[in-house]
Amino acid sequence: LEFVSLIPDSALDFLKRLVETPSPSGFEEANAAHFREYVAPFADRVTTDPMGNVIAAVNPEGSPRVMLAGHIDEIGFLIHYISDDGCCYFRGIGGHDNVVLVGQRVVIHTNQGPVPGVIGKKPIHLLTDEERGKKVDMADLWIDIGATGGREEVLAAGVRVGDPATYEYGYTPLLGDRAAARAFDNRIGAWVVAEALRRVKELNPKAAVFAVATVQEEVGLRGARTSAYGIDPHVGIAVDVTFATDYPSMDKRKVSELSLGKGPTILRGANANRKLADHMIRLAEEKSIPHQLEATPGGTGTDANAMQISRAGMITGLVGVPLRYMHTPGEIISLSDADNAAEWLAVTCASLGSGDDWTP
């Protein structure tokens, strides 16, 4: 991959560790450790709050206070019932498209270690006409770990009610600068804010810059709420994936026209401060950073939503990394979009000063 040479090996290795380490919402500790390890050499301060958010700061006493948020959790499954015949029934952690679940290889993460399994369902050959016409219901699916001795064999393997599970897919390079992985939503956002912090350190910002690996975004933007309250930033910019529309079935009239490889996106709409968005667009044009415009009329389903209304409110922005096939085991991104997002955030943070007025 020609593009990979533009990203330091250590940064690319960090990204691979992030996407290959399972961390569904509520179980983010392993990836929080990766984040802390990566930012430690250049951050002036690294802390972890009671929710599990990792907060890395450069120039923490500076002004204004700027929060960059990228969530490190992912969608997954939670075991809630083990049947007498040894089937592990589950609920979704975050939102799932049930159509893609059947037959997927998964891993249950137990206190005794990982237990592989497969999501099972009644074969199509045995479905009645009525059953074939129904939507796939998660309640009709189960995780099969190969047990033939019923519930006792499953328990002996270490599986318990309350254990999380995730898809068994890691990082896969594709053509050009593209890559596929299970959890680019939103490990790529966490990677971007960490990389932005590393780069802004070299620019000696006047602002206090806080890169936050937020938790539990997929179940209600919970980590962003608490970390934003604690940091009390003047400016908050979230980084998350957004819908690429450069493949079949995507109706640009209903979403936007966004493509892989054409740069990160900047939100325009109620969930973004207009002055900040315009400032970032001007910076991107001056620095020749590829970028795309995205529009949403109301709140978004991202950390930017929680950040904007934290305490008495803050100046908020949202940067997106275009992604194909969101919330599936095979999400695809362009590495150049992520690299450009990190650069964009770094120069943005370096441009901010205590006398700036972003009030609408």
Role assignments for model-derived ranges:
Residues 1-360:
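N-terminal hydrophobic/helix-forming segments and targeting peptides
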